[in-house]
């Protein structure tokens, strides 16, 4: 496919919906990038909220996206921090590259029956994947406990 055309569509979509801290500027691991990719935790949380509330595209498309997120097989970060039986719909991102370093990210809709919420934990330049995953799980646990106390 044509990366530039696809990136333009993604960036326009983000701008139209005021995800102003998100930009797709280069192919993943491009050898000589002329631009960069970035996203904020705030934009990620808004995106997940819009999907959960059915207000991102339309009810059917948003429901389909939610089902895809529920099917995530990497459950080593945010899902570790919530009690057994609490479902999550999450999207992870990870990178371990000699030049770019270690990145571990996870964003999720925590589908708790009494207090569903969204959470995004993004990292950059951490020492190891396992250390970052453990930290994300700890943050997730702390957030879950806080949200549960707000009933």
Residue ranges and their predicted role:
Residues 1-56:
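Mid-domain, small-residue-enriched loop/turn segments at the edges of structured enzyme/sensor domains
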Residues 2-4, 47-76, 81-86, 91, ...:
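Structured C-terminal helix/loop/strand segments within mature extracytoplasmic catalytic/sensor domains
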